From Swiss-Prot:
The gene is tolB. This is Tol-Pal system protein TolB. Gene3D superfamilies: TolB, C-terminal domain. The lineage of its organism: Bacteria, Pseudomonadati, Campylobacterota, Epsilonproteobacteria, Campylobacterales. PANTHER family: PROTEIN TOLB, PROTEIN TOLB HOMOLOG. GO terms for cellular component: periplasmic space.
Length: 402
C-alpha cells in the first residue's frame, strides 16, 4: 500500500489566493491592445477592485490581447463594463468596442454574490467569442480540489481557475480524488471511507447529495469518465493489488482491464472514441505510462522519456504527463505528446510541476508548481506558448480535477 500511496499522493502543496496575481512566461508575440473601462458605481470597493483585476487577468490569460492602461480608444479594442449590486444579486453590462465602434453588448445576471469571479470569466469568454478570436470556453469552468484539513481528514472544494472563489463541498473524514462526472459539471465522483472500507461516491451538485457507487478493499479511485459519462475508469485493489477496471454506470458491470503483479493505476481514456486507455505502471521497475485497447489485455509502452512518469491526463489523442528529470534532484517537468507521433514537447522548465489536467477543449493545461518555498497554480496556454501563475497559500493539496 505504501507504493500505491506514493504514486497517487505524489506531492502536497498549498492553496489560497487573494486577488489573482499573474506571472507570465514565454511571452513575446505582438497582440492587439485592449483597454478596460470600469463604469461601475459600487460602494463595495473590495468587490469593485477584485472584479476589475479578474477581468484584466482573464483578458491576459486568453492570450488574445495586450491589456493597456493608457491608449486611444479609436485605434484599439475597449472592454467597457458596468457592474451593479442589489443585495445578493449582481448584474453586468459589457460593451466591446473596436476603434470606437460597438462590436457586441451583453447583459448578465448572477444570483450569488460569492460567485462573482465566474461572472467575470463568463463575460470575457463571451466577448472573445463575439470577436471571433481563439476561444476560452474553459475559462468559467470549475476546478475540484481535495485538500488536507487536519490529520486523516480532507475536504473537497470547488474553485474558479484563479482560486478567488472557493467553496467547501464535501467535509468530514477523508475525502479524496475528486473527478468531474460530466461536461456540464453538475456531478463528480470521489473516494471516501464507509466503515473503514474505501468507497466510491457520486456527488450531485443539484441536490447536494452523495450516493454510493461501489466499494473495494485496498483502494478504489475514479480516474476518468467517458465522453458520454456512462463509463468510469477505476483503480481498485481488492487483494492489495492495484489494477485498472472499467465500470459501466448503466449496467453496473465491472471489467478488469489490467492484470499485472505490480502496480497499474490512474487509467485515462484516450482516442477520439474512448477505445483505448493509458495508465501508470511500474512494470519496468519505475512508474511509466502504458496504453492498451479496451478489448485487449496487451499493454504497450507509450512514453520513452524519463524514469518517473507518475501523473497523466488525456485529451483525444494527446496526453500530458509529469516526469522527474534525471540528474536534477526534485525537479519534475510537464510534457505533451500525441500517441500518433514521436514528438514530445516540454511545457515547463524548473521546480516541481505536478497534477497536469487538460481543459475541456484541450487548449489549456492546469497544474501545480512548487519552486523553493513558493507554490502556484499554473495555466499553460498551449497554442500561445504562454504560462500564467496564480499564487497558492495555506492548505495542502492532495489532487485536482478541471
Amino acid at each position: 500500500m505504501k507504493k500505491i500511496v506514493a504514486i497517487f499522493l505524489v506531492f502536497l502543496g498549498s492553496l489560497w489566493a487573494e486577488d489573482p496575481v499573474i506571472d507570465v512566461v514565454n511571452s513575446g508575440v505582438v497582440l492587439p491592445k485592449i483597454i478596460v473601462k470600469d463604469n461601475s458605481n459600487l460602494s463595495d470597493e473590495n468587490l469593485k477592485k477584485s472584479f476589475y483585476n479578474i477581468i484584466v487577468n482573464d483578458l491576459k490569460v486568453s492570450s488574445n490581447f495586450e491589456v493597456v492602461a493608457n491608449a486611444t480608444e479609436t485605434s484599439n479594442y475597449t472592454f467597457e463594463y458596468t457592474l451593479n449590486k442589489n443585495g445578493n444579486t449582481l448584474s453586468l453590462n459589457v460593451k466591446i468596442k473596436a476603434g470606437g465602434s460597438d462590436k457586441s453588448e451583453q447583459t448578465y445576471t448572477l444570483n450569488g454574490l460569492e460567485q462573482y469571479p465566474f461572472l467575470a470569466h463568463k463575460s470575457v469568454k463571451a466577448s472573445v467569442n463575439a470577436l471571433g478570436l481563439a476561444p476560452v470556453d474553459w475559462m468559467d469552468h470549475k476546478i475540484l480540489i481535495a485538500r488536507n484539513s487536519s490529520s486523516k481528514k480532507s475536504q473537497i472544494i470547488m474553485a474558479d481557475y484563479t482560486l478567488t472563489y472557493q467553496k467547501v463541498i464535501v467535509d468530514g473524514g477523508l475525502n479524496l480524488f475528486p473527478k468531474w462526472g460530466n461536461k456540464e459539471q453538475t456531478l463528480f465522483y470521489y473516494t471516501a471511507y464507509d466503515h473503514d472500507k474505501p468507497t466510491l461516491y457520486r456527488y450531485d451538485l443539484n441536490t447536494n447529495k452523495a450516493s454510493k457507487i461501489l466499494s473495494s478493499g485496498g483502494m478504489v479511485v475514479a480516474s476518468d469518465v467517458s465522453v458520454d459519462g456512462s463509463k468510469l475508469l477505476v483503480t481498485m485493489a481488492p487483494k492489495d493489488q492495484p489494477d485498472v477496471y472499467l465500470y459501466d454506470l448503466n449496467t453496473k458491470n465491472l471489467t478488469q482491464l489490467t492484470n499485472y503483479s505490480g502496480i497499474d493505476v490512474n487509467g485515462n481514456f484516450i482516442g477520439s472514441d474512448d477505445s483505448k486507455v493509458v495508465f501508470v505502471s511500474d512494470r519496468l521497475g519505475y512508474p511509466n505510462i502504458f496504453m492498451q485497447d479496451l478489448n485487449s489485455n496487451s499493454a504497450e509502452q507509450v512514453v520513452f522519456h524519463g524514469r518517473n512518469n507518475s501523473a497523466v491526463s488525456t485529451y483525444k489523442d494527446f496526453l500530458v504527463y509529469s516526469s522527474r528529470e534525471p540528474n536534477q534532484a526534485g525537479v519534475f517537468n510537464i510534457y505533451l505528446m500525441s500517441i500518433n507521433s514521436d514528438y514530445i514537447r516540454q511545457l515547463t522548465a524548473n521546480g516541481k510541476n505536478l497534477f497536469p489536467r487538460f481543459s475541456s477543449d484541450g487548449g489549456s493545461i492546469v497544474f501545480i508548481k512548487y519552486l523553493g518555498a513558493q507554490s502556484a497554480l499554473g495555466v499553460i496556454r498551449v497554442n500561445a506558448n504562454k504560462t500564467f501563475y496564480f499564487p497558492l497559500r495555506v492548505g495542502k493539496i492532495q489532487s485536482i480535477d478541471w
